[in-house]
Design a protein with these regions (language model features):
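Active-site-adjacent helix/loop patches that line small-molecule binding or acyl-intermediate pockets
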Residues: 86-99, 182-262, 269
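Surface-exposed patches in mature extracellular/periplasmic domains of secreted proteins
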Residues: 115-119, 159-164, 206-210, 229-235, ...
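Short, conserved catalytic-motif segment at the N-terminal edge
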Residues: 111-135
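Short glycine/serine- and small hydrophobic-enriched flexible loop segments
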Residues: 148-156, 199, 247-254, 332-339
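Active-site SXXK
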Residues: 125, 136-165, 312
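Active-site-proximal loop and beta-strand segments within enzyme catalytic domains
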Residues: 154-191, 195
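Structured C-terminal helix/loop/strand segments within mature extracytoplasmic catalytic/sensor domains
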Residues: 2-110, 127, 253-274, 294-382
Length: 382
């Protein structure tokens, strides 16, 4: 019996030992399977992340291209709006405190003198005037109107510049340098009469031109342009204020800018005119000017061809000596004023066109959407 029991125990032990290899194999299999699955899962995560990163990079690249294209389009639109603004005429709403201060300083300076001035920038139409309603004796400034009338009518075919007029004794007056080489009875062309009246302010040439044109015709012509004081006062010179001066200068400028066969010829007479204190030879600035002088009246009206062309009328009661130096000084101050006008205009257009867009771009940078994390966050702007 004992042997039988012992044998039974041994058989049970053998059966248990036979089960262990299977269990070990099962565990090894499961462990191997786990490792395989884990590695596959890791590879999947890596592949997924790489794929995600790749796709997000592509999306971001496309978005960046779209943003850059939009920025370029916006920049082009802004530049067009800026150029439009720059080319617009000046308006009072754009005046800065600095420009106001410059104007006030100029006004305070002018209060020291008996004079009137008017300045008009041709491009922007900015205008500054002082004592503009005061009326002066025109003196030789009226000769500008003689010249414009003759050359305008020549251009329109109403007269020939080479037509002549007889120089008679009744036309001969003082201060007639151009006609000194002519004898009484000589014939003088209209072209030369205008040339002498402008370049050397020949008074006899002026008398002959007024006679040729007709006093009333010349007066009506000045009025038709917008002048209020043309030939008022009982002689062939009349009266003038700075507003009339600008009217004459504007018409002269328009004639010159038409680039007709006569434009440069007439312009050259005014550029070469004597007593021209609006030109600045040191800085290469030319001016198409006509002066006027009688007693204490001393004037300069001109188109100043600076970097930006402007009209300037300075009418004074200062006489030639003080008047000439004062006119030069005022012209320099006007150039400073004009510089401020353009700086003011540029800054105004920059603020108007670019500042709003720049504010929008700043806000756009402050709030950027982080697509990977799935929420909006503020990012530091470098």
């Amino acid at each position: 019996m004992k042997k039988s029991k012992t044998k039974s125990k041994k058989n049970k032990s053998r059966r248990k030992l036979k089960k262990w290899p299977k269990l070990v194999l099962l565990l090894i299999f499961l462990a191997t399977l786990f490792l395989i699955l884990k590695k596959s899962l890791d590879n999947y995560n890596i592949t997924f992340n790489n794929t995600y990163d790749y796709l997000m990079n592509k999306i971001n690249e496309q978005k960046q291209k779209q943003d850059e294209k939009k920025q370029q389009e916006n920049k082009k639109k802004q530049d067009e709006e800026y150029n439009t603004c720059i080319n617009q005429k000046y308006s009072e709403k754009e005046k800065s405190e600095k420009l106001t201060q410059v104007e006030n300083e100029l006004t305070d300076y002018l209060k020291n003198y008996s004079l009137s001035i008017k300045f008009v920038d041709v491009k922007t139409n900015y205008t500054y005037s002082y004592n503009e309603s005061k009326v002066y004796y025109a003196a030789s400034t009226i000769k500008m109107l003689d010249a414009i009338y003759i050359y305008r009518n020549a251009l329109e075919g109403n007269l020939n510049l080479d037509s002549t007029k007889k120089y008679t004794k009744n036309f001969k007056v003082a201060y007639s340098a151009g006609l000194e080489k002519y004898k009484i009875g000589d014939m003088v062309s209209l072209r030369n009469l205008v040339k002498y009246a402008i370049t050397v302010s020949d008074n006899s040439a002026h008398q002959m031109l007024v006679d040729y044109i007709g006093f009333n015709n010349l007066k009506k012509y000045g009025n038709s342009l917008g002048a209020k004081n043309t030939l008022i006062g009982g002689d062939n010179f009349g009266q003038i204020d700075v507003n009339d001066s600008i009217v004459y200068l504007s018409e002269l400028y328009n004639f010159i800018e038409e680039n007709s066969e006569f434009s440069e010829e007439l312009k050259s007479y005014f550029i070469e005119s004597d007593e021209n204190f609006l030109k600045d030879e040191e800085n290469g600035i030319k001016a198409a000017t006509k002066y006027g002088e009688y007693g204490n009246f001393f004037h300069n009206n001109g188109i100043v061809y600076a970097e930006n062309t402007y009209f300037l009328s300075i009418l004074t009661n200062l006489g030639k000596k003080n008047g000439s130096s004062t006119i030069k000084s005022i012209n320099r101050k006007i150039q400073g004023l004009q510089k401020n006008v353009y700086e003011n205009h540029v800054e105004y257009c920059k603020q108007k066109i670019y500042s709003v867009q720049n504010d929008w771009q700043l806000m756009n940078k402050l709030l950027k959407y982080n697509w990977r994390d799935g929420y909006e966050r503020k990012e530091k702007i470098i």
